[in-house]
From Swiss-Prot:
Transmembrane intervals: 15-35, 51-71, 92-112, 133-153, 174-194, 196-216, 234-254, 340-360, 379-399, 412-432
Protein name: Guanine/hypoxanthine permease PbuO
Keyword Cell membrane recorded: yes
Gene Ontology CC: plasma membrane
UniProt organism field: Bacillus subtilis (strain 168)
Family stated for the protein in its record: Belongs to the nucleobase:cation symporter-2 (NCS2) (TC 2.A.40) family. Azg-like subfamily.
Alphabetically ordered keywords of this record: Cell membrane, Membrane, Transmembrane, Transmembrane helix, Transport
Induction of the gene: Expression is regulated by the purR regulon. Down-regulated by adenine and up-regulated by guanosine.
Membrane topology note: Multi-pass membrane protein
Cystine pairings recorded for this chain: none
Record localization: Cell membrane
A Pfam cross-reference name: Xan_ur_permease
UniProt KW Membrane keyword: yes
Length: 432
């Protein structure tokens, strides 16, 4: 079913890869409820909804597309929903109405995924931009690891600066990073997961990891279904004029997922002649998960860049994603345990930093000799970590690419879809 021999992998390797991916991204089941609480959504509601959406999307990715990519509600759009859509409306838009907008975007997303458009879009992206996306995601994910661990910290004059290297959390991260790097240098199977497990044990014995709330609890949805009638959802969007909100959800989700899929697939060696096999099935995963998640009460889902950690651990097939889905299902009954582990950034940050370094390898495939090819890709690489947004990096690449190509007199090399989305990105960034 998963073609393990064809991908030169094994059940053990895929399970270890799935566990690695899960533990690097499980923070979302705690962080997402905290962020959406600012919109008034009950914590337990979002906790359970986040897991349900993640299971649906990741299972689809595993069984239909056979990709080692996990799906979950994305960071960024959850904050956009909580602060820009709900809180900024001063009571004019409830969180239930906001989820109607998410649901509508999800349905439109499914329709787009069923058409050839998204597949054509992936194939239309110039090779240099594809390599730039992979490299930019690598820098972004490494920066996330450094920031979460406290190795770099916010600074008023320089934006970021070196963190407190005497902090127990930072020291633990550096120890975990050293363990993981040494294991990878020695080509130890499951190096990243072993490094995470070793760091967790050190955290426990040094008093940084506590299980004061126990290990298990029963899941529940205190408000039931957020959207019981899909037709009401569309009506809410029309009544409140949430067209710009739906457009933002749709555009950002499309390119967050597309960018992550390209980056992870490139890293895993799944791209065939710069094309993704089973791409339509893969693209349906996040759109379906977004729609289901909105019904229960969570923000739009996306392909998680932390999937690259599982790929670095050897994940090559949907068995990796299936393992992640099973772990998400189990986490529904172990919220205190999950909360405790995800609260220690030092456990997962080393894996993110190492994966970032591995993804940087794509920079060697880029054409740096032609300015009209190099500069748009450079903007993608630069913008992703500096704006903390994959879609913004892609947007700047898309907007600049037609401009520099036309200036060079190479307008015939510009795919029409690149021009269309360059215009859409310009509208989203500078007008909406």
């Amino acid at each position: 079913m998963f073609h393990l021999k064809e991908q030169q992998t094994s059940i053990k390797q895929e399970i270890i890869a799935g566990l690695t991916t899960f533990f690097t991204m499980v923070y979302i089941v705690v962080v997402n409820p905290v962020i959406l609480a600012n919109a008034g959504v009950p914590f337990d509601q979002v906790f359970t909804a986040t897991i349900i959406a993640s299971i649906v999307g990741t299972l689809w990715m595993a069984l239909a597309a056979n990709y080692p990519i996990a799906i979950a509600p994305g960071m960024g759009l959850n904050a956009y929903l909580a602060f820009h859509v709900v809180s900024a409306s001063d009571g004019g838009i409830t969180y239930a109405t906001a989820f109607s907008a998410v649901f509508t975007a999800g349905v439109l997303f499914i329709i787009l995924s069923l058409t050839p458009l998204r597949k054509q879009l992936i194939e239309a992206i110039p090779n240099n931009l594809k390599y730039g996306i992979t490299t930019g995601i690598g820098l972004f994910i490494a920066f996330i690891g450094l920031r979460q661990a406290g190795i770099v910290a916010a600074d008023e004059s320089n934006l970021v600066t070196l963190g407190n290297l005497h902090s127990p959390g930072v020291i633990l991260t550096l120890v975990g990073l050293l363990i993981s790097v040494v294991l990878m240098v020695l080509n130890v199977s499951g190096a990243l997961f072993i490094g995470m497990a070793a760091t967790a044990l050190i955290a426990f014995f040094t008093g940084q990891l506590h299980f004061s709330k126990g290990f298990m609890s029963l899941p529940h949805l205190p408000e039931g279904l957020m959207i019981s009638n899909p037709f009401t959802a569309f009506g809410d969007v029309i009544h409140h004029g949430l067209y710009a909100v739906v457009f933002s959800f749709l555009l950002v989700t499309i390119f967050d997922t597309t960018g992550t899929m390209i980056g992870v697939a490139e890293q895993a060696g799944l791209m065939k002649n710069n094309k993704l096999p089973n791409v339509r099935k893969a693209l349906l995963a996040d759109s379906t998960a977004t729609t289901v998640g909105a019904v229960f009460g969570t923000s739009p889902t996306t392909a998680f860049i932390e999937s690259s950690a599982g790929v670095a651990a050897g994940g090559r097939t949907g068995l990796t994603a299936l393992t992640v889905a099973v772990m998400f299902a189990a986490s529904m009954f172990f919220s205190p345990l999950v909360s405790a582990l995800s609260g220690i950034a030092a456990i997962t940050s080393p894996a993110l930093i190492i994966v970032g370094s591995l993804m940087m390898g794509s920079v060697s495939n880029m054409n740096w000799k032609e300015m009209d090819e190099a500069f748009p890709a450079f903007l993608v690489i630069l913008a992703m970590p500096l704006t903390s947004s994959i879609s913004t990096g892609i947007a700047l690449g898309f907007i600049s690419y037609p401009i520099v190509k036309a200036a060079r007199g190479k307008w015939r090399e510009i795919h029409p879809l690149v021009i269309v989305f360059a215009i859409l990105f310009f509208i989203q960034l500078f007008i909406l």
